[in-house]
Amino acid sequence: MIFRTKADLDSHPCFNKKASASYGRVHLPVAPHCNIQCNFCNRIYDCANENRPGVTAKVQTPDESVKFLEKLFKFRQDISVIGIAGPGDPMCDADKTLATFEKCKSHFPNALLCLSTNGLALPEHVDEIVRLGVSHVTVTVNAVTPDVGSKVYSWVRYEGKNYYGEEAARILLARQDEGIRKLKEAGMLVKINTVVIPGVNIDHVQSISAKAKQWGADIMNCMAMIPVHDTPFENLKSPSTEEIHRIRRSIGGDIEQMTHCSRCRADACGKLGER
């Protein structure tokens, strides 16, 4: 791994609220495919107007991403982090994701590299992620028991086969557990993202935070589910701001809570709150 000082690592605006006032991030939308189907996601990522995770104006190739960054860094010196978060799952498109990080490591050695994933295809790539100098990884964990997971996920595609129900959730949870443990053993900074879904996992978040603490995760981000058209959860209400605040207060003793998330698009660029 590239040597980083604590000051370097602390300049990630998502992992450090103070840094978000001074530093921004850029997400490179190089990974369009996904290996799980969440019941709150319609997998339609080509959108220029919606401001939520999983959407982008276009998908870039690794080379297009480098050209974009070369132009960006000419007028944005406040971008400290290059991240890959979709619009699908970066580890489902591992070849594109890792090739992009390889190019970024070579062309922009001072930038922090960041990855966001559901964790299903994470374990087998941890060594390569470390080699490429990725320092911050976010894993989205919406359940830590198969019964709850079976309500969140429609299916999981693992080793070329689709799995459903509790079997699917059990596979995903085992892979997340293995991947996160490997990340922490490698010295990575790890954030756990949890989509809070009323009537599904809202009363389960405390169990997720306890597991995150057990993993040694560094910070947790509880995000309100956004109802999306043409999904199984399209008619569910998004949890209120007060409900999210209550959850954060109740689990803050387990693990530090991120309170400044802007639920970034897969092509987000700038400080949090900017597109």
Language-model features, listed with the residues they occupy:
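Conserved AdoMet/S-adenosylmethionine-binding subsite of the radical SAM
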Residues: 91-223, 228
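N-terminal [4Fe-4S]-dependent radical SAM core
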Residues: 1-29, 34, 43-59, 71, ...
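Short glycine-enriched, charge-decorated loop/helix-capping segments at active-site entrances
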Residues: 52-57, 153-156, 165-166, 234-238
